[in-house]
Amino acid sequence: MQRDHDVASDVSAAANDWEARIAAVWASVQSQSLSGEALVATVDALADERAPGDAPAMFERACARDTAGIEDAAEGYYRAALATGQLDAYRSSRASIQLASTLRILGQLDESEQLLIAELDRHLQPGNPRPLHDEARAVLALTYVAQGRAKEAAGLALSALAPRLSRYNRSVAGNAADLVEKTWD
């Protein structure tokens, strides 16, 4: 029994170590010390440590490619990671939002919009967390702009901004609601 506990502890520690090393890679990107090519190679090396089909590893591969500007290569990894159903709520939201952003960049605007609306609708379900809610609204606003729907984009962006204003927040929220059909407040 103790041996089983030790193995489980070792697996948990290894997963935590992997997460820490992935976080360190992204910190080095923030400090601009890694090129896109080096980022992809580094993340791929770390992802190779995980089991084939590991959702977090596929997600990190997608992120690396997205950050490196090779969105077409990121798309499949995002889709595969999401399809497993094994991402935690935060990574799942990130994957949905980032896939939608990638699709927007690739010109697949309708699918980008559909993904973001589905993500935002999930946030409104009772008991569901709302990680990155405003971020999803921001990317949807960008998708609206790309679709030529600037009025709706402004409404969505202003509805996200309104609660943070020190003054005029009710007025801005009311006007924002007049510009867009749904704000996901």
Residue ranges and their predicted role:
Residues 1-56, 61-72, 85, 163, ...:
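N-terminal alpha-helical interaction modules that lie
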Residues 32-37, 72-73, 101-111, 142-153, ...:
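Alpha-helical linker/edge segments of TPR/alpha-solenoid repeat scaffolds
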Residues 37-44, 75, 82, 113, ...:
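Tetratricopeptide repeat
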Residues 56-130:
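Alpha-helical adaptor scaffolds
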Residues 59-60, 98, 138-139, 174-175:
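"A position-specific structural signal for the A-helix of alpha-solenoid helical repeats
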Residues 117, 121, 145-167, 177:
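TPR/TPR-like (Sel1-like) alpha-helical repeat modules
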Residues 121-153:
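Ankyrin-repeat and related helical/solenoid repeat scaffolds used for protein-protein interactions
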